[in-house]
């Protein structure tokens, strides 16, 4: 059982926003979670069950991006009101504000050393600032449409940006030059980020795809077509071996990057999932959606071999366009397929949550080469038949899971109505007793 991963499970379920949740991020100490919303509010959720959440008000329009500093002492938020705010994540909610752009600020991100900020805007520019006193340093200006996202590389030497001009640009922070443009997306790119090793980038796009490039060779090495809707956000597991994606199709997808396949499909949000983020240690991930909810999930699937996986997080050997399983311990490479079990946490109204994890045999679109090209045609046909059968079974299981979720919701509504009737009856009895009492002199 040592190499057998467990299924992700729902841990917490937060309600408090009054409109679509657009962005989420964990405090590096994993004790707090920040979320921004179209309701213009920043919420700080405390992971301890009994601690109250903080609502920070200051932005005049929707918050589109939040990011904790590496120290956890500050939170940066970017807004449609064209400003960036730096908040202290305490009960006082103190903040400083600066006008960052002449258009909507869609993205804000700290550098790895916590000394710099990078912002991206509808004014078609990317700007870099000092955190101390929010001093403007320089601007990157080659995009010809809105810039939706910008991130520092882990070592802080590079910046990656994604724009509605359908390009992803890689910038050298020192020379301030664009060193490469990736133009292989059929749609707009909503989100882009660096792999923890700094050797690759992944992008989420409106053409329902997720693509991974090796930035040393400027080569597309993985191409996933697993969503049926626009992909809004993604997050790398800190080990670098997993990628989680959030989509308008109401699902989260967990991808195994080493084996190039889909691991899990998670159902929980009612409507588009707009944001997803792993915690700094990878133990949890959070998601936000148009249903105004924030969900925290326990990763689980990395627990059995996390220590081993970290050993293989080498800057020069991962995702080199060759053998995707080169960094996986031999015991884990050919583990048998299994059906993942549905798991729910009984915390903060979990009856609204429905989570299923699909079988891992779901086909992926490869760009580098087909992993089955060496098999005879007959065997290949058999494999396709088996895969088709498994997909059908998984589809039926998914329908059953959804049905159970609906039944649970109906049962919960019945329980709530019954409790309300009992409360009303008790109140009526109490009033009746008080009315029959005669005053004593």
Swiss-Prot record:
Which Pfam families does the UniProt record give?
WD40
| Stretches with biased composition (Basic and acidic residues) | 331-340, 348-361, 371-380
Q: Where in the cell is it found?
A: Cytoplasm, Cytoskeleton
**PROSITE patterns assigned to the protein according to its UniProt record, in alphabetical order:** WD_REPEATS_1, WD_REPEATS_2, WD_REPEATS_REGION
Tell me the function of this protein.
May play an important role in centriole assembly and/or stability and ciliogenesis.
Q: Which residues form a coiled coil?
A: 400-427
Matching entries from Gene3D superfamilies are given as: YVTN repeat-like/Quinoprotein amine dehydrogenase
Which species is this record about?
Xenopus tropicalis (Western clawed frog)
The protein here is known as POC1 centriolar protein homolog A
Mainly resides where? cytoplasm
